[in-house]
Amino acid sequence: MSFEALRYDVEDNILTITLNRPEKLNAFNYQMQNDLIKAFDEADKDDNVKAVIVTGEGRGFCAGADLSSGKDTFNPSFDTFGVKEDDFRRDAGGILTLRMFKFLKPIIFACNGPAVGVGASMQLAGDIRIASEDARFGFVFANRGIVPDACSSWFLPKIVGISKALELTFSGRIIESHEALDISLISSLHKPENLMNDAIN
């Protein structure tokens, strides 16, 4: 399969999905959402895929929503989203995380760099989250005056506890990878050059 916003590589029964918009720090847009959903649909049907690793190309995992289109950022056309305007649902990250939650095989997120907004919240639907020492995480929705997206108000308290989830979302602060490990947002921390090999192992 070919995708515009990601790479899809299967080797030794492991599918590696690489978010591939490095010029924008892999910022999330509707093309990426559609590509990710199609990738998980394809992997669910492929008996050769036993597990999935999701990572980012370049120095970032995902910089959050791509806001470069201004007011049209969340106003997709039929051609780019595949639905009529009347059928449009606003939380693109939520549609993605619910698809991942229904996925039949293990999903490992290997966070290689900064992950903010939907870049952080999409990882909550994974089964395992590991990160490089270069990773940072931010549930920054309060900074924009919006509620947390991608079902993170359900996932995050189950992972880090209600008090820490509230503190992270109320403050909107960015946390370093060592703090993410301390609060069990990730399960292990790795040298950047070892991240993918460790994820595979």
Ranges and model annotations:
Residues L98-N201:
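Crotonase-fold acyl-CoA enzyme core
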